[in-house]
From Swiss-Prot:
This protein's name: Cytochrome b
Molecular function via GO: metal ion binding; ubiquinol-cytochrome-c reductase activity
Requisite cofactors: heme b
Cofactor binding, note field: Binds 2 heme b groups non-covalently.
Matching InterPro entries: Cyt_b/b6_C, Cyt_b/b6_C_sf, Cyt_b/b6_N, Cytb/b6-like_sf, Cytochrome_b, Cytochrome_b_C_euk/bac, Cytochrome_b_N_euk/bac, Di-haem_cyt_TM
SUPFAM superfamilies referenced in this protein's UniProt entry, alphabetically: a domain/subunit of cytochrome bc1 complex (Ubiquinol-cytochrome c reductase), Transmembrane di-heme cytochromes
Organism: Carollia brevicauda
PANTHER family linked: CYTOCHROME B
Residue spans crossing the bilayer: 33-53, 77-98, 113-133, 178-198, 226-246, 288-308, 320-340, 347-367
Residues noted as binding heme b b562 in the record, renumbered to the chain: 83, 182
Gene Ontology annotations for the cellular component aspect, listed alphabetically: mitochondrial inner membrane; respiratory chain complex III
Amino acid sequence: MTNIRKTHPLLKIVNSSFVDLPAPSSLSSWWNFGSLLGVCLAVQILTGLFLAMHYTSDTATAFNSVTHICRDVNYGWVLRYLHANGASMFFICLYLHVGRGLYYGSYTYSETWNVGILLLFAVMATAFMGYVLPWGQMSFWGATVITNLLSAIPYIGTDLVQWIWGGFSVDKATLTRFFAFHFLLPFVVAALVMVHLLFLHETGSNNPTGIPSDSDMIPFHPYYTIKDILGFLVMLTALSTLVLFSPDLLGDPDNYTPANPLSTPPHIKPEWYFLFAYAILRSIPNKLGGVLALVLSILILAIVPMLHMSKQRSMMFRPLSQCLFWLLVAVLFTLTWIGGQPVEHPYIIIGQMASILYFLIILVLMPLISIVENRLLSW
C-alpha cells in the first residue's frame, strides 16, 4: 500500500516540500536561516494576534493599552517582549540569510532572489509600522520623519505625504491605518514565502561549493529536519534569554514617554535594524538624494545577479572576493553604529565614507575582483 503522505492531495505537497525533498548533502548551518525565518514569522503572527486582542489604535489610548497589556493581561509582558524582540531576531536571521545568498552565489536563482527582495521590503514595511503602534515619543517622531521623506518626490510629494497621514500631521488617522496594515502585511509576507519556496523547489537548493549537486542528494527528512530543529532550539533559547533577562536592551528609552507633538527627542532614530539605511540617508545633504540612496541601499540587491562576473558561483574558492565580502560586512556594522550617533563631527564624515564604500564595493570592486580572479584561474 502506498503511503498516505504520497497520495493525499494536501499531504503530497507537504511531503514533496519537507519530507522527500532531495537536498544537497553538503549544506552547512548557513542554510538553517530559511527555516528559522519561518519560525520567526510564526512567532510574530501568533504573538501579534494576541496583542491585537488588547491593543487599541487610538492616539488617546494606544500608549495606555500597551501599558495595560504589560501590567494587567496574563503574561501580556511576555507577549509584548516576545513580539518586540522577535522582530530583532527576525532581522538578524534575515540579514544572515541575505548574506549567505551573497557569499555562496544563491542570487543566480533570479526568481527566488527577486521574491526574497520583495519579502525583505514587505518585512521592513511591517516592522516600521509596528514601531509606530506603541505611540511613544520615538514612535511618533520616527513616523513623522520617515513618512516626511516622501515629500522629496517632485511635484506629488507633499500631497502624497498628507494622503498617507490622513491629515496635516501624524495623528489618529495615521495610527489607525498603520495598525490595519501592520495586521495585514504579515499574511502577505506568508503568501510571498510560499512563492519564494515554490521558485526554490523549481531549481533545488544551492550548496556551499556552488557546484551542481544532482548526483549527490539526500532526503530532507530526517537529515535536515533534525538540523533545523537544533537551529530552532538555539534561536528560541537566545530569544527567551533576551526576553526574560534584558527585554529593553534593543529598544529606545524614549518610547516609554507618551508621544508629544510639541517636544522633539534630542536624537530621532529608528530601530537598530534600520540604522545602516538611516546612516546612508543622513550622509547625503540633499533630501531627494538621501531618499534615493536609502531605497537603493536595499534595491541594489536586485542588480547583484547582473554584476556577477566570476566563472565560479560561490566565494568558497575565491579568497580575494571573500576579503571584499567581509569588508562589506564591516562597512555595514560601521553604518549601523553611525546611524545611532548624533549628526556631528566626526560621525558625519565617517558615515559619508562608509556610504561611498558600501556602494563602491557592490557596484565596482566586486565585479572587478571577480574579473581579476578569472584571469588568475587561467594562469
